[in-house]
C-alpha cells in the first residue's frame, strides 16, 4: 500500500476489527489500486450527535481511505471531487504553519473564493470556513469502529 507523506514516519500496527464483505471488498480494491487507507482515532465530541447512525463519539476509531484529490491546485479544478455532507478526515496546515487533523464534513464548497465550510455534527461546535489551500489531504470515513 502506498504510504501518504503525512505518515512517512508512522508506525504501522496490525489492528483487528469486524467488517462486512462490502468493506472487505473495498479494502482489497484499495490494496490493488495502491490507495492509502488506515484506521485513525478521533478525539473530542465535535462529531457526536443524537443520530446514532452517523454519530462519531469521542475516542472512536474510523476506517478511512485517501480520496486522492489534488489539494495543491485551485478549488475550481477539483470542487466536483469533494464529497459534501459526509464524514471526512481532513489534514492541513494553516497560513501560520500549524498542522491540523480533523474529522468533519464539508458542508459547502466555494470555488470562487477558494474555501470550504467545515461542519461538525455536534450543534455546540461552530462551522469553520477555511481556505482550500490549507488542506493537504482528504480521506473519506468508511466505517466507525
Regions picked out by a protein language model, each given a short descriptive name:
Residues 55-57, 64, 132-138:
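Extended Gly/Ser/Thr-rich low-complexity repeat segments
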Residues 1-61, 68-74, 81, 96, ...:
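Short, positionally conserved secondary-structure boundary motifs
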Residues 93-145:
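Glycine- and charge-enriched low-complexity intrinsically disordered segments
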Residues 41, 89-91, 117:
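Residue-level detector of beta-strand face positions
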Residues 64-65, 100:
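Coil-to-alpha-helix initiation sites in intrinsically disordered, low-complexity, charged segments
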Residues 82, 88-90, 94:
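Long alpha-helical scaffolds
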Residues 74-77, 86-88, 100-108:
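Short beta-strand-centered aromatic/proline hotspots
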Residues 62-64, 90:
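A generic structural signal for residues embedded in beta-strands
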